[in-house]
Amino acid sequence: MKTTHKTHGLARLLAALLLAFCSATPLFAQAFDGSDDSKIYLGYTNVGGRHGVEIGYEEGINDFLSYGAKFTTLRYKDDEGEKESRFYDFSDLGIYLNYHFMEVLKLPDNFDIYVGPILSTKTMSLQTGVRYNFGEVFGVYGSAQYNFFKTITIGSNLGVYPEKFAFSAGITISI
């Protein structure tokens, strides 16, 4: 894999911005705040060895459950000189329901572990993850999911998402 100075510079910039956001916020926060919780998140994702980004929104239902939606798109490298857009093949939109263990396991307020199913345009999946909030607004997350089988997948590249592990990490913003 070839990396460039631009890639390293972007990673340093993102790390510096994350550090600045985290140090500028108070140190009292909840990673999951029940029915009062609304978050957006943005992060890096890797699905079966393909790199990409994900963005999502999550809303709390009660102290244990939340629901949300997320959009994932993976990098597509055109090795064969194809002119057609393959955006649909390398993108996925899904909805999910998460169970949060913060209350059950008596975890610190700024730390949460969650698990739940995902139904998307490409797959049916199960995810698990952790969140850590640095303040009332900003936090970080890490997530892993396994895409069990395809759902309504159409297109020319049917194997990008189904039956693959996906790993994600990024920032959360409480709204």
Kindly give the residue locations of the regions a language model identified.
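Transmembrane beta-strands of outer-membrane beta-barrel pores
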Residues: 42-48, 71-77, 99-103, 117-123, ...
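Flexible, solvent-exposed loop segments that connect beta-strands
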Residues: 31-40, 69-91, 111, 150-161
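Cleavable N-terminal export/targeting peptides
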Residues: 1-35, 175
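Outer-membrane beta-barrel "beta-signal"
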Residues: 93-99, 162-175
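Membrane-embedded beta-strand positions of outer-membrane beta-barrel proteins
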Residues: 40-42, 69, 95-97, 113-117, ...
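Short glycine/proline- and aromatic-enriched beta-strand/turn motifs that initiate or cap beta-hairpins
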Residues: 25-71, 172-174
